[in-house]
C-alpha cells in the first residue's frame, strides 16, 4: 500500500499520556497495547479463512483491553454505544425467554462480536496500524481467492459425469456429478491420479469411494463393489472429467458467508483503487488484480444478492468520488448487470428474480409465516434460532414443503421474529446511526491522504452493500460477515478520531 504523508499520524488511544516512559507500568502498558494490536493482525489474517480462531483472538483482545481500562487507560468517546447496548440487552432478554435456550445462547455468543467495533476503535492508534491491518486482510483474502481459482483450474477431484438410474452404482448411492476425491485412500484429484488409483485398486474387491456432492460441498465415503465400478467404467458413454466445485465456498462451510466476506473485502479494495488511481501506478495494478480476483471468486459463488450488492457498492463509490463520470458509472453498472444475468442464467438456469426456484420459494414461505409469529411475541420474540427446534410446531410452511431447516433469510425479519420489534428498532437505529456517521465524516475524509481516504471510502461502500444484502439474507447470522462489519466500523471510527486529532494539532501549531 502506498505511503502517505500522514502514515505516522497517531491518535490519543496510545500508551497513557503523562506516564513516565521509564516506569514499569508504562512499559507494561506498551506491551499490552502491542498484544492487542497483534490480536487485530491475527483477526485480519484469519477472517477470510477461519472465523472461530478469529473470534478467540477477539476475546483475547477484549480481555487485555479490559485490564488496560482497569489500570487507568482512557476510554475515548465512542459513537453508537447507546443503540448497540440496547440491541444486545434486548437480544439477551430474548435469549432468556427463548423456546430453544441452548440454540439462543450459542447465537447470542456470536452477537457479542459487536464489541469488536468498540475494541478496535479504542485501540487502533495510528494510520500506519490501519494500513497494516488492511494489507494483512487483502493479502489473506488473495490467498483464499487464489485457492478458489486453483480449485476451478486444477479441479477438486474426478467427476462421474453420468450414472444411469438403472445402474448398480446408482443403487449403491452414487449419482451423476459426484466428484471422486479418493479410492481406497488413493487420491483422484487429477486425471493422472485417477489413472494411478484405478491401477492400484484393480484387484480390490471392495472400493471405499470418497466423493464430494452438492453445494455447499458435502464429503461422503461409501463402499461399492470393485467389479461393479470397473464394469461401469468399461461401458460406452460412461465418462469422467475434471471435477470443479458447483459453487465457490473457500474454507467456509457455505458459499453464502464466503460471498459476504468477498463482498466486504472487494469493496474495501475498490475504495482503495479509486482513491489511489491517479497517484501510484504500481499500487493501482496490484489493487486491480486483487479486485478482479475477488470479483471472479464472488461470481463463482453464483450468489445473486451479493453480486448485485458488489455492483451497487462500486457504483456508490464512483458516485461519491467521480462526479464527472457518473453517467459512465451507471452505464458500467448496467453492463455488469447484463453480464451477471448471463452468468446466472448459465450457472443456475434462472434470472435475478427467479421466484419459482426452490431457494426463492423457501424464502417467500418463511416471510409469509413471519408476521404471524411476530404478532404472537412482539416484544421479545421467540428466541434466537428457536425456529430450528420448534419450526414444525409453529407450522412453518417451508418446513413442511422442504427438508431444509433454516432461518428467515432476512436480518430484519429474523430479528423481529427472534428478538421482537424493539430489538429490531434498536438494530435499525444502530445501522442508521452508522450510515449517518459515515456520510457526515466523508466530507472530511475527502481531504485525507489517499490510503485512509480509500479505506474509509471502501468501508462506506461496504456498509451500503451490507444493508442492501441484509434485506434478503440473514447477514447478522453469518459471523464470517459480521466479523468484518464490526472490524471495519471500528477502523472507520478510529480513522476519524486519529485524523481529527492530527488536524487539531496542526491548527494549534499554525
PLM regions and their residue ranges:
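Transmembrane signal-anchor hairpin modules in multi-pass inner-membrane enzymes, especially those
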Residues: 1-103, 115-138, 176-177, 182-186, ...
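Transmembrane alpha-helices of multi-pass inner-membrane enzymes
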Residues: 60-66, 267-268, 310-311, 326, ...
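Hydrophobic alpha-helical transmembrane segments
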Residues: 91-95, 128-157, 209-237, 296
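Hydrophobic alpha-helical segments of polytopic membrane proteins
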Residues: 115-117, 122, 266-345
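A membrane-periplasm/extracellular boundary helix in multi-pass inner-membrane enzymes
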Residues: 139, 146-157, 300-301, 318-360, ...
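Long extracytoplasmic/lumenal interhelical loops at the membrane interface
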Residues: 233, 243, 354-368, 380-419, ...
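A conserved mid-to-late transmembrane alpha helix and its immediate loop/hinge
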Residues: 246-257, 371, 377-380, 401-438, ...
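Hydrophobic transmembrane alpha-helices and their immediate junctions
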Residues: 273, 421-464
Amino acid at each position: 500500500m502506498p505511503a502517505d504523508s500522514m502514515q505516522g499520524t497517531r491518535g490519543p488511544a496510545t500508551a497513557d499520556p503523562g506516564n513516565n516512559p521509564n516506569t514499569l507500568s508504562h512499559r507494561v502498558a506498551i506491551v499490552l497495547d502491542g498484544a492487542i494490536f497483534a490480536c487485530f493482525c491475527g483477526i485480519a489474517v484469519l477472517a477470510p479463512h477461519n472465523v472461530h480462531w478469529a473470534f478467540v483472538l477477539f476475546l483475547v483482545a477484549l480481555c487485555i483491553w479490559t485490564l488496560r481500562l482497569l489500570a487507568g487507560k482512557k476510554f475515548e468517546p465512542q459513537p453508537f454505544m447507546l443503540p448497540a447496548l440496547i440491541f444486545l440487552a434486548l437480544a439477551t432478554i430474548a435469549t432468556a425467554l427463548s423456546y430453544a435456550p441452548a440454540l439462543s445462547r450459542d447465537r447470542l455468543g456470536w452477537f457479542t462480536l459487536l464489541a469488536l467495533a468498540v475494541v478496535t476503535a479504542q485501540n487502533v492508534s495510528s494510520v500506519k496500524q490501519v494500513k497494516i491491518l488492511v494489507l494483512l486482510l487483502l493479502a489473506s483474502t488473495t490467498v483464499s481467492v487464489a485457492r478458489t481459482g486453483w480449485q476451478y483450474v486444477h479441479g477438486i477431484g474426478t467427476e462421474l459425469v453420468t450414472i444411469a438410474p438403472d445402474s448398480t452404482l446408482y443403487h449403491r448411492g452414487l449419482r451423476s456429478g459426484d466428484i471422486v476425491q479418493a479410492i481406497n485412500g488413493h487420491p483422484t484429484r487429477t486425471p493422472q491420479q485417477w489413472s494411478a488409483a484405478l491401477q492400484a485398486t484393480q484387484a480390490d474387491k471392495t472400493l471405499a469411494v470418497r466423493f464430494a456432492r452438492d453445494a455447499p460441498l458435502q464429503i461422503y465415503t461409501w463402499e461399492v463393489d470393485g467389479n461393479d465400478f470397473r464394469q461401469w467404467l468399461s461401458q460406452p458413454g460412461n465418462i469422467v472429467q475434471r471435477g470443479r466445485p458447483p459453487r465457490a465456498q473457500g474454507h467456509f462451510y457455505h458459499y453464502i458467508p464466503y460471498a459476504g466476506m468477498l463482498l466486504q473485502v472487494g469493496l474495501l479494495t475498490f475504495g482503495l483503487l479509486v482513491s489511489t488511481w491517479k497517484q501510484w501506478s504500481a499500487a493501482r495494478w496490484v489493487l486491480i488484480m486483487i479486485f478482479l480476483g475477488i470479483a471472479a471468486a464472488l461470481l463463482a459463488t453464483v450468489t445473486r444478492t451479493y453480486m448485485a450488492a458488489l455492483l451497487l457498492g462500486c457504483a456508490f463509490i464512483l458516485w461519491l468520488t467521480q462526479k464527472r463520470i457518473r453517467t459512465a458509472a451507471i452505464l458500467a453498472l448496467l453492463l455488469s448487470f447484463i453480464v451477471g444475468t448471463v452468468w446466472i442464467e448459465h450457472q443456475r438456469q434462472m434470472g435475478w428474480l427467479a421466484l419459482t426456484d426452490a431457494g426463492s420459494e423457501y424464502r417467500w414461505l418463511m416471510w409469509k409465516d413471519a408476521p404471524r409469529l411476530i404478532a404472537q411475541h412482539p416484544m421479545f420474540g421467540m428466541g434466537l434460532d428457536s425456529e430450528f427446534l420448534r419450526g414444525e410446531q409453529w407450522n412453518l410452511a417451508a418446513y413442511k414443503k422442504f427438508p431444509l431447516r433454516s432461518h428467515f433469510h432476512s436480518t430484519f425479519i429474523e430479528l423481529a421474529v427472534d428478538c421482537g420489534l424493539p430489538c429490531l428498532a434498536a438494530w435499525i437505529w444502530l445501522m442508521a446511526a452508522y450510515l449517518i456517521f459515515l456520510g457526515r465524516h466523508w466530507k472530511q475524509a475527502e481531504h485525507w491522504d489517499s490510503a485512509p481516504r480509500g479505506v474509509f471510502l471502501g468501508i462506506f461502500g461496504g456498509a451500503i452493500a451490507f444493508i442492501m444484502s441484509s434485506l434478503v439474507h440473514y447477514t447478522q447470522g453469518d459471523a464470517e460477515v459480521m466479523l468484518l462489519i464490526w472490524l471495519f466500523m471500528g477502523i472507520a471510527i478510529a480513522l476519524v478520531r486519529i485524523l481529527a486529532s492530527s488536524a487539531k494539532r496542526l491548527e494549534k501549531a499554525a
